[in-house]
Amino acid sequence: MGGMKAKAFGQMPELRDMRRDRMDLLRSRLGLLGGRDKVLMTLYVENGSSFRQIARLRGVSETSVARRIHQLTRRLTDGDFLRCVRNRDKLSRRQMVIARDAFLTGLSLRQIAEKRGVSMYAVRKELAEIRRFIRETRSVTNPL
């Protein structure tokens, strides 16, 4: 049975190529992260550490490490924050830090408001404007 599994994977080089491409993409975007998230993803992407190894180092459960890595992977490969980065000249500095907090770090409205010293209303208003901008730029680059 094990031989069949190995043979099946050997016949799917496109899956290996897709995984390699995804890891290269993540590697190229590690600089967008900061703090613990950057360390976590560096251990995973650059060092090839397993969830179990990272969990032992951090003193947390393997599940929480896996969950955070999957969240960060999704956010790093999602186009919303990158669209903001590519068009940062059209967004204010405040909008850029709020976009980073929301789309990349995954902070809640309340957490962003506390971190940035503004009201939740102000954060909600800025995020609505950022999302509108993202929709507009998406429709320009990908017209239906």
Segments (PLM) and residue ranges:
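DNA-contacting interfaces and partner/effector-binding or oligomerization modules
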Residues: 1-52
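Short amphipathic alpha helix immediately N-terminal
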Residues: 34-47, 91-107
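DNA major-groove recognition helix of helix-turn-helix
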Residues: 45, 69, 76, 102, ...
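Short alpha-helical "recognition helix" segments of helix-turn-helix
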Residues: 53-58, 111-118
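Short, Lys/Arg-enriched C-terminal cap helix and immediately downstream tail that follows
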Residues: 74-87, 131-144
